[in-house]
Amino acid sequence: MSGAGEQLIRLNEVMARLRVECPWDREQTHVSLLTHLIEEACEVVDAVEEGTDADLCEELGDLLLQVYFHARIAQDEGRFTIDDVAQGIADKLIRRHPHVFGDGEVPEDLRGVWERRKRQEKGRTSSLEGIAQSLSALARTQKVISRARAH
């Protein structure tokens, strides 16, 4: 197994070349890729629930491609890079896990602490703010119930 860094760099290079040399890849936008993003996320769910390790590995790769594709589009537009995406999520995980990366103790209500930190970071006053509008009705309802239970 090679280091993740090597293969992620390779994927970034492949994506950069595709955006230059492949007409289909070059034409894509964040909006045109939304259907693919949702489809790949659903295929990951299917692989977790019913697939093999090989299926899950493949579907996670397809989902990772979507992340890199969107980041490459943003980079081509001068907005942000895949490094910005990775730095942002790593920083967020560290901030939200002081019991791991700081001197905080493990709280009994880890989920509640996570949600409170998230609200503070986003400047939200209600636990119901920030629920994705594009979620299905069922998923949105589940999210509302989950957040309500956390309070």
Q: Which positions does each model-derived feature cover?
A:
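Flexible "arm" and connector segments at domain edges
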Residues: 1-59, 65-151
